[in-house]
Structure formats: structure tokens, C-alpha cells
């Protein structure tokens, strides 16, 4: 049994030496200062075990007095399987957080964390190795002191088995952690190579982009020069158009003033003609009254009716002229000339017809007798009424034609003026639209240049 135990201890020592050689390069100067704190934490963890563990920590009393000194007994009491349980020994090992993924470029904080983890693992390994050597020494002392007793052998076997299990589990976990760290280091190296390659490609693209931007800047400069020349030409054209408009405005004002003067003159002529016409009508009526005293009773009604109708026509014509004057003061030049000519012709015709009638009446009065005068007067009254009706119809027709001609002439003048105004407005709108388009294009190109 002792040979088997010593063989297991030798194999464990070989493993420990190989692990020590592997981790000697990783240890730093901080490990020595942290050993005391780790050992104290381990003892505190072992002390904070369950009540069952404290009960098991009590030494097992042998059947008889054991050989050896009191120091050997103290060592036996110190070496109990509960104190060397696998739970408390494995609690010292720190596991790597597998959920944390490595980034392509590891910052300084992550490197510090990796170094801290490696340092902590090295500390735990050193502490566990020291604890294993102590256990080996305690077991050898226990075997020397408890030679020949079965209970102590069984306790030693249990103790060895438990410690061998803890050591194997710790070694397995440490190997797993080492493999994980190696994988992480490889991933970090691959990410670093990838980032270097990406940076090289980005530099190449950046140089290409700078060359393209220089070409674009040169093109933009040439386009800006062209646009500045176009803007200068547009400004000159705009100034010329403004000058033409300013020259055209006073001409229009003079034309409107001339039209107003002509309209006023025509209105004065129309008023004088109407006053002359009324005076002539009054003279004709007075002559008829003096000459036709005999036919006063029968002809009075007709003359009064004619007088009233003529006055109504006169008022109606005056009202019509006033309305047209208020509505269309600036656009009746040609129509008023035609109206004046027709009025003069109608006045001449009326005067001739009145003279003819007066001569005929005088002839009838002189030639016929008083008996035949009544019949002739009746006949003449009928003829006069018919002729007056014809004259009224002719006057009304001429007035309607004059009104239609006046309205058509005014409409043509109004349409021509409105068409001129629309043409001017459309020209101004087109010029404004062109200038706004050019300004928008310039603003867009300036914004693009600023973005570049």
C-alpha cells in the first residue's frame, strides 16, 4: 500500500513540475505579494463550511496510544478529509467568461483583463501546488506515525483519493482554461491581421477617392467659371429689358393721356350737338305753332307726344352716353367719330324733311279752302304720323347700329390692350422664371462644392 501511495505521489509530483515549468514564464512579480491574500481567503472559505464539515473535523480517537510525539498527533488532527474537500479547493479557480466575444481590435482594458486572469490562474496554481506538497508531507508523516493501524490507513486512503480527485479536476479545468485562452489569442491575432488588411485596403481606396475628388474639383472650377459668365450675360440682358420697359411705360402714359383728351373733346362735341338739336327742335315746334293755328286742337296732341318722345330719346341718349363715358373713358375714339358723322347726317335729313313738310303745309293751306282743309289736314296728319313713325324707327335703328359699332370698337380696343398687358406679363414671368432657375442651379452647385 505504501508503494502504491508513493507511486501516485511521484506521478503527481511529475505533473506538478511540468505545470510549474509551463507557468514560470507567465508569473509576474505581483504573484508573490498576492499569495498571502489567496491563502487567507482559502482558509476563510474552509472555515465557512457547513456544520457537518465542522463535525467531521474532530479528530478520530484511536483504540490505543499511538506511537510518536505530540506533534504527530497535532498533524493527525490537522489532516482530516473534510478540510481537504474538493468543493473548497476548486472554488479558488477562476473561469473565463465565455459569453464575452473578442473584438477585431482589442483595447487596453481587455488586454488588462486577460493579464489579470492569467495572473490569477497562476496564483491559484502555485497555491494549489504548495497545498499539495503540504498534503504529501502530512500524509508521509501520518503514515510514519500510524504504521500498523487500520483506521488511520483507511483515513489516509480516503484523504489521498479525495486530494487526487481535486488535483485532477483542477488540472482538467486549468487545461480547459488554457485552451480557451489560446483560442482567444488566436482569434485576436486573426482579427489583428484582418484589421491590418482592411486598413491597407481603406488607404488604397482613400487615395483613389482623393484623386477622384481632385478631378471633380477641377471640373467644378471650370463649371463655376462658365456659370459666372452666363450670370454676367443674364444680368446684361435683364438690364436691357428693364431699360426697354422703362422706355415703354412713358409712351403708354402719353397714349392714355391723348386718348383721354380726345374722349373729352368728343364728349364736348356731342353735348353741343345735342343742345343744337334741342334748340332746332324747339324752333321747329314754334314755327309749327305760329303757322298752324287752325290745326292747333288736333295737332297739339301729336306735337306734345312727339315733343315728349324726343325729350325721352334725348334723355335716354344722354344717359347712355354718360354710362358709356363712365365705363369706357379711354377707348372710344373711332366709334365716337362714326357716331358724330351719323348724327350730322340725321340732323341734315331731319331739317330737309321738316322744310319739305312746312312747304307742303303752306301749299295746302294756300291752295285749298277751309272745307277741304279738314280732310287734307286729316290726311296730312295720317301721313305725318306715318312719317314720324318711320323716322322714329330709322332713328332707333341708327342708334342701335351705332351702339353695336361702339360696343364692338370698344371690345376690340379693350381686347388689344388686355392682350398687350398679358404679353408683357408673360414676358416678365418667363424672364423671372429663367433667372430663378439659373439661381437655383448655382445654389445647388455651390452646395455640392461645399459638400465635396
Curated annotation (Swiss-Prot):
In this chain, the stretch annotated as Disordered covers 1-85
**Which InterPro entries does the annotation name?**
FAM81
Q: What GO cellular component entries does it have?
A: nucleus
Signal peptide as annotated in the record: none
Q: Which residues form a coiled coil?
A: 164-192, 329-452
Bias kind Polar residues: ranges: 1-11, 38-55
The entry's keywords: Coiled coil
Q: Does the keyword Coiled coil apply?
A: yes
For the keyword Coiled coil, the answer is yes
* The family this protein is said to belong to: Belongs to the FAM81 family.
The protein's name in its UniProt record: Protein FAM81B
Species name: Homo sapiens (Human)
